[in-house]
Each structure stands twice: as C-alpha cells, then as structure tokens.
Amino acid sequence: MRGSSNKKIDPRIHYLVPKHEVLNIDEAYKILKELGIRPEQLPWIRASDPVARSINAKPGDIIRIIRKSQLYGEVVSYRYVISG
C-alpha cells in the first residue's frame, strides 16, 4: 500500500472531460424559459459527482456542459444538480 497523501486530483484537467460551469440565476432562468421547462425536467447530475464537486455545484444549481465535437463543433447541454 502506498503512503497516503492529501493530494486531490482535479477531474476537469483530463482531456476527455468536457467543460462544466455553474449558471448564475439569470442565465438559468433564461435557459429554462427558452426551453419551456422546469429545472427538474433537465437531465440530472448528482452533487457528489467528481466534476460537480470540483466546481462547487450545489443541489438546485444548473450546470452548462460544453463538449467539443468533430461533427458539430461545440455541443451545449445542461444538467440539474440533485443531492446525493
């Protein structure tokens, strides 16, 4: 067994992990209004997810995820943060 270390690995630095960002209230309201949905209707992400923890997302927040795609350039998706 290796010696324990307090180092924390930031999952956001891996090249396969897309950019995640927490939306502010105004941005979240605008997105929900454009889509015509309630926050609970978005796909969910748990607050315990490594990336959600690294960006300090809390239950009730909405996260914007920006993925790079060879076919479409950038693909934007949203997730609603739930407890767990």
From Swiss-Prot:
Keywords: Cytoplasm, DNA-directed RNA polymerase, Nucleotidyltransferase, Transcription, Transferase. GO terms for cellular component: cytoplasm; DNA-directed RNA polymerase complex. PROSITE patterns: RNA_POL_H_23KD. Its main location: cytoplasm. GO terms for biological process: DNA-templated transcription. GO terms for molecular function: DNA binding; DNA-directed RNA polymerase activity. It comes from the Archaea. Signal peptide: none annotated. Belongs to the archaeal Rpo5/eukaryotic RPB5 RNA polymerase subunit family. DNA-dependent RNA polymerase (RNAP) catalyzes the transcription of DNA into RNA using the four ribonucleoside triphosphates as substrates. Part of the 13-subunit RNA polymerase complex. This is DNA-directed RNA polymerase subunit Rpo5. It comes from Saccharolobus solfataricus (strain ATCC 35092 / DSM 1617 / JCM 11322 / P2) (Sulfolobus solfataricus).
